[in-house]
Design a protein with these regions (language model features):
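Short coil-to-beta transition motif at edge beta-strands of beta-rich domains
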Residues: 72-90
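Extended boundary segments
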Residues: 10-48
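Short, solvent-exposed secondary-structure boundary/capping segments
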Residues: 106-116
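Mixed-charge, Lys/Arg-rich low-complexity intrinsically disordered regions
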Residues: 41-76
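Short beta-strand-centered aromatic/proline hotspots
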Residues: 90-107
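Intrinsically disordered, low-complexity, charged/polar segments
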Residues: 12-18, 22-27, 117-151
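Short, Lys/Arg-enriched N-terminal segments with co-localized hydrophobic residues
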Residues: 1-9
Length: 151
């Protein structure tokens, strides 16, 4: 009886959290996705880099809780991102990343200004990078529900 009661309470908490997550407008970009779709899109991006099998596995592991963002509508202030700079195809590497503190529209393109844990600021041009944004707990909750419904 005790275990059943705990499961009912946890189920109610998860239900309330899911409703709260769905009401959050910042999560609107995730509603048409699923974990499988996110992995497929991420894989398509990484395959374009023509990485070795081991490097590809390593990148997938490092980007497990991230999704690709390729337009301005999905990039959100205060979110943690990592990116791969495409300017030098001979030196492809995944950055440790930073938190988005500003988005700047300039004559030559759109730039994202980030700050890392050492307060170092970095400016990246959206058109020259593959950008991966870390999933929030709310987004993970929505994805879990969408994955369940997809079965």
């Amino acid at each position: 009886i005790k275990i059943t009661y705990i499961c009912i309470i946890m189920s109610k908490v998860n239900e309330e959290y899911l409703i709260k997550s769905l009401d959050n407008e910042n999560n609107s970009g995730i509603e048409n996705l699923s974990t499988r779709k996110i992995k497929a899109i991420k894989n398509d991006y990484l395959q374009q880099l023509q990485l070795s099998r081991e490097e590809l596995k390593d990148y997938h592991k490092k980007l497990k809780e991230y999704r690709t963002v390729d337009d301005l509508t999905n990039i959100q202030y205060g979110r943690y991102i990592r990116w791969i700079n495409l300017k030098n195809p001979e030196n492809i590497c995944l950055t440790t990343g930073g938190v988005i503190i500003d988005i700047q529209l300039q004559d030559d393109g759109i730039y994202v200004l980030c700050k890392n844990f050492r307060n170092k600021r970095m400016k990246i041009k959206i058109d020259e990078c593959f950008i991966f944004q870390k999933l929030t707990d709310q987004e993970k909750t929505i994805l879990a529900a969408l994955d369940y419904l997809e079965k």
